[in-house]
Each structure stands twice: as structure tokens, then as C-alpha cells.
Swiss-Prot record:
Annotated pathway: Protein modification; protein glycosylation
Transmembrane segment boundaries: 12-32, 110-130, 151-171, 190-210, 237-257, 278-298, 353-373, 393-413, 418-438, 441-461, 476-496, 514-534
Lumenal topological domain residue ranges: 1-11, 131-150, 211-236, 299-352, 414-417, 462-475, 535-550
Cytoplasmic side: 33-109, 172-189, 258-277, 374-392, 439-440, 497-513
Protein name according to UniProt: Dolichyl pyrophosphate Glc1Man9GlcNAc2 alpha-1,3-glucosyltransferase
One Pfam family in the UniProt entry: Alg6_Alg8
Protein purpose: Dolichyl pyrophosphate Glc1Man9GlcNAc2 alpha-1,3-glucosyltransferase that operates in the biosynthetic pathway of dolichol-linked oligosaccharides, the glycan precursors employed in protein asparagine (N)-glycosylation. The assembly of dolichol-linked oligosaccharides begins on the cytosolic side of the endoplasmic reticulum membrane and finishes in its lumen. The sequential addition of sugars to dolichol pyrophosphate produces dolichol-linked oligosaccharides containing fourteen sugars, including two GlcNAcs, nine mannoses and three glucoses.
Source lineage: Eukaryota, Fungi, Dikarya, Ascomycota, Saccharomycotina
Membrane topology: Multi-pass membrane protein
């Protein structure tokens, strides 16, 4: 009889993805870089040249150190490998404005590429620790993150270290999936000590670890109030608390006498509501409406008279002269300045309001985790916590959309009903990053790479995600509307590029210089907010979707 060969399980490796992406990243070394490049160069200089206690006081340059201590230690570590010819190029000079050449550019670009190896390693661990039946899905998720357009645009052209930082966050996600709760808490604490933007995810981590690891609700039976002491697994609480406290002690301990100064650097509340380029969130729509109303009222005064009959001050300016005075005196958000934004027509927004809105929607996201601390619920809660902070937060950067896309990538494979929201979020989110690369030389790379990624992975996710288990296929809005929105992104991007190219030639186009950024912000915010609505509906009202398969 012929020997029957056992079918070997498929091997899913990210090695080929790393090699191919490495070649592209090396080609991008001499490309455009943003002011963030000099920011990190200055941080290299500060951590290399100054004593540790002076790191958060140094202000020769406007690019002061404003990341948590672990990232400062990371910059110090990188500075130890700066070659002598790069030092002589000005890489480690503490100056007001950096003066450097190609040696510094090459060195810093290579540090980003080298540090991103951790991302590929963590994603490979995610694949290898998945069940054999889930390896294909895990591979799609891991590869989509590994070659994400977001990391290419933000890290390898614009210049940051997000791939390395998100690797640590993903390590905590992988630990949670494998029920390694102490490692989950440890890696999240480390990530938080590297970049404080991860603080937005703290509510979902706190509730998840509390419910899954610390509280003993499964076997708990209430007979008297004395029994409440047994609801807590005290040993687990001590171990988890020790891990978290020890991590923060290592990070912040050397700065114990300078914590007030450090905190003022980490949380500069003097910044305005919106960034120079409006992040595509709720406040982008709010700002756009204010801008349109201002133009309409000034161009067509009768519309103001009509509106003032139904709306009275302070909800609307008392007169057209007041509108003109506000336009002349304040930054109305259309100048591309990073400072306090004052709305001309609509009521002003204060930090307290943005905090309350963010907190409200984050609380709604974490409550279900108290009753069902499954990995699927955890990922849904993390995605919605990220969305709440992105949509309603104060001074949100467009790059923060990665805080939403990454956890959603781990969630979407669980059910095809999530795919419409995911496609909306990723397409709008990645396109919203295009203004970061405003030079014409980068137009083809950012558009072609992003569109190819979208086509490949939208089909891959559709093929590998689980089919809906409920009888009624409740999909947010209509899949066709999602496709229409996504296809309209293509002409929007090309028309804006044409306007930018012709803007210097025609005076009429120069009068609408900020129109391109406004269209990007407004249209992408519509897609992201729609994705939030869709995911929120499924998260709160489609119970069969969240039935745990663990």
C-alpha cells in the first residue's frame, strides 16, 4: 500500500514581507521628512549631552522633550550608537534649529527601520500562538499591520517611531488573547511609559484586567457583606499591582523630584482644540460648519438676519460687525496655526467639554467588558475607547487614527458584519494621513501604496472573516453606501492634488489655500464617524456577534 503522507500545517511567515518592505524603506531614506525629524534629533542631543535631571528642563530649541521617560531612555540608547562622522554632521548638537546633512538623515532613518523589527517579531508571535484553525486569519491581520500605509507614511517618510511603539502595545494584546494577564498589564504599562497617548486606552485595560484577572465573580455567591472580601483575588491583585507599580517606578523614579516639570511637558493644555491640520473627527465637522456659516453670513448678509430671528446671542454673534471683528482678531482655525482656535459663529469649545464627551463614550465602551471579559469584547472596547478619544479629544493629531485601526484589525476577523465599519475606518483614516506628505514627489507613493493595500486586504479580510451567525444580517447602513464613499475618495484626492498644483498659478485658487485641508478633514471625518456609529451599534445591540468562542 502506498504510504499516506500526513498533511503538514501551513507555515505563515512575515519574513518575505519584512524583506520587501525593507527595500522600499531604504529607497525612501532621502525622501521628504517633517519637523518631527529635527524633534527626534534634538532629543538625541539632549539625552546624550545633558544629565538626566535636565532632560525635561532643556528648551534651547522649541522641540523640547515631551514624551515619557522610557522614550527618553530609548533616545539615549540610540544616541550611544551615533558614529563620529554623524556627530560631526551636527546630529548631537543642542541648537535652536538643527543644522545637519545626509549622514544624520541616514542614521535616523535606519534607527526607525531597525526598531520596527520588533513589530514584525511581535506579529509573528501572534501568528505562531494562534490556533491552527485561525492561522490564516491571524496571518492576514499581522501582515496588514506589518505593511500598513500608516506606518509607511508616518514613520518612514514623515518620521516617527510608531512601528516600534505599537509593537509593545500589540504585545499586550497578544498576551491578553493568550490569557497571560500579568504580561498584558506589563506590556501596556511599558507602552504607556513610552508614549502617553496610550493613556486613552487605560479604561478598557483597567476594566478588562480587573474583571478577567482580579475579580472572582464566576464562583462568587453572596450570603452576607462579609463575603464581599472574597470577590477579589487578592493574590492576583498584588501581583498585577506590583508589576504595574514597578514598571512606573523604573520609568519615573529617576525624575521623582522633577515630576511637576515632567507632567507639564507631557500634558501641555495651552494648545488649542485642533491641530494645524484638523484631525478628521467631530471637531473638524464643527470647525467646517463654523467656517461655512461665517462665509455665508458675510457674503449674504440677509442670511444672518434670517438666522438672528430664530437664534439670539450668545449662541450667535450680535451683529455682522462682531463677526468681522472676530475674523480679524482671532485664529478661526483656517490659518493652519497651532494655537487656540476661536469660532466665529458657533459656541466656543472648552477642554472640560471634550474631556466629558470622551469619558462618556469610553464608559459606554467598557461597561460590557464588566459582564463579558472575553478577548473579543476587549478588542471592541479598545477600538471604541480609541475612537472616543480621537473623535472628541482635545488637540488630537491625525496620526492618532492608528490607535483605532490597530485594535480594530484584531477584531474584524471575528465576524463579517464588522467589515463595513472596518473598511470605512481604514480607508478614511489612511487617506486622512495624505496631507502629512504635501510635496508632489510623494503623491504617487502615498496614493498608489494605500490603494493597493486597500484592494488587497479588503478582499483578504472579506475572504477570511467568519460569516455572520445570526439569522438577521444586521449590517450598519448599507455595504453599497460604504463602497460609494470609498470610491469617492479617489476623485477627491486627485482633484485636491490638481488644485494644489494649480494654486500658485491662479489667484482665485490662492484665496482658498486652506480648502484642500478642510475637504480632507471633513470628508474623512464623515467616514470615521460613520464607522464609529456602525461599530457602536453592533457592539451594543448585536449580542450574538459577541458570543465568545474561547
Amino acid at each position: 500500500m502506498a504510504e499516506v503522507k500526513e498533511e503538514q500545517p501551513k507555515r505563515f511567515s512575515l519574513w518575505n514581507f519584512w524583506i520587501s518592505s525593507l527595500l522600499l524603506k531604504l529607497l525612501l531614506i532621502p525622501d521628504y521628512y517633517s519637523t518631527d525629524f529635527d524633534v527626534h534629533r534634538n532629543w538625541l542631543a539632549i539625552t546624550n549631552k545633558l544629565p538626566l535631571r535636565q532632560w525635561y528642563y532643556e528648551h534651547t530649541s522649541q522641540w523640547t522633550l515631551d514624551y515619557p521617560p522610557f522614550f527618553a531612555y530609548f533616545e539615549w540608547f540610540l544616541s550611544q550608537f551615533v558614529p563620529s562622522y554623524v556627530k560631526s554632521d551636527g546630529c548631537l548638537d543642542i541648537v535652536e534649529v538643527g543644522q545637519f546633512g545626509m549622514p544624520t538623515v541616514v542614521f535616523q532613518r535606519l534607527t526607525v527601520i531597525a526598531s520596527e523589527i520588533l513589530l514584525f517579531v511581535v506579529l509573528q508571535v501572534y501568528i505562531n500562538t494562534s490556533k491552527v484553525s485561525e492561522r490564516t486569519q491571524s496571518f492576514v491581520v499581522a501582515s496588514s499591520i506589518a505593511i500598513s500605509p500608516g506606518f509607511l507614511i508616518i514613520d518612514h517618510i514623515h518620521f516617527q517611531y510608531n512601528g516600534f511603539l505599537f509593537a509593545i502595545l500589540i504585545a499586550s494584546i497578544v498576551a491578553a488573547k493568550n490569557k497571560k494577564y500579568l504580561w498584558c498589564g506589563f506590556f501596556y504599562s511599558v507602552a504607556l511609559c513610552f508614549k502617553h497617548i496610550y493613556l486613552y486606552l487605560a479604561p478598557c485595560y483597567f476594566v478588562f484586567l480587573l474583571r478577567a484577572y482580579v475579580l472572582n465573580l464566576k464562583d462568587f455567591k453572596f450570603k452576607s457583606y462579609r463575603d464581599l472580601i472574597f470577590i477579589v483575588k487578592w493574590r492576583h491583585l498584588v501581583k498585577l499591582g506590583s508589576v504595574v507599580i514597578a514598571t512606573f517606578a523604573v520609568a519615573f523614579g529617576p525624575f521623582i523630584f522633577d515630576l511637576p516639570q515632567l507632567l507639564t511637558r507631557l500634558f501641555p493644555f495651552s494648545r488649542g482644540l485642533t491641530h494645524a491640520y484638523w484631525a478628521p473627527n467631530f471637531w473638524a465637522i464643527y470647525s467646517t460648519i463654523d467656517k461655512i456659516l461665517t462665509m455665508v453670513f458675510l457674503k449674504m448678509p440677509y442670511t444672518y438676519k434670517l438666522a438672528s430671528q430664530f437664534i439670539s446671542p450668545p449662541l450667535i454673534p450680535a451683529s455682522l460687525n462682531e463677526i468681522k471683528a472676530k475674523m480679524a482678531a482671532n485664529n478661526n482655525g483656517s490659518k493652519g496655526l497651532v494655537e487656540d482656535v476661536y469660532f466665529v459663529i458657533l459656541p466656543q469649545i472648552v477642554p472640560k467639554l471634550t474631556f466629558l464627551l470622551t469619558l462618556l463614550y469610553q464608559v459606554l465602551a467598557v461597561v460590557p467588558v464588566l459582564f463579558d471579559p472575553s478577548f473579543k469584547r476587549f478588542m471592541g472596547s479598545m477600538t471604541l475607547c480609541g475612537l472616543a478619544s480621537f473623535l472628541f479629544g482635545w488637540h488630537v493629531h491625525e496620526k492618532a487614527i492608528m490607535l483605532v485601526i490597530i485594535p480594530f484589525s484584531f477584531l474584524v476577523i471575528s465576524d463579517r458584519r464588522l467589515l463595513s465599519s472596518f473598511m470605512l475606518l481604514t480607508s478614511a483614516g489612511y487617506v486622512s494621513l495624505f496631507p502629512l506628505l504635501y510635496e508632489s514627489q510623494d503623491f504617487l507613493i502615498k496614493t498608489f501604496y494605500t490603494y493597493v493595500w486597500c484592494v488587497i486586504y479588503f478582499f483578504a479580510f472579506r475572504k477570511t472573516t467568519r460569516l455572520s451567525t445570526s439569522v438577521e444580517r444586521r449590517v450598519f447602513f448599507l455595504d453599497r453606501l460604504t463602497l460609494v464613499y470609498m470610491f469617492l475618495l479617489i476623485p477627491m484626492v486627485f482633484l485636491i492634488q490638481i488644485r494644489d498644483i494649480l494654486g500658485w498659478k491662479y489667484l482665485v485658487l490662492q484665496r482658498f489655500e486652506f480648502l484642500s485641508l478642510m475637504v480632507y478633514s471633513f470628508y474623512c471625518s464623515v467616514g470615521i464617524i460613520s464607522a464609529w456609529f456602525g461599530l457602536s451599534w453592533l457592539y451594543n445591540f448585536d449580542e450574538p456577534l459577541w458570543v465568545s468562542n474561547e
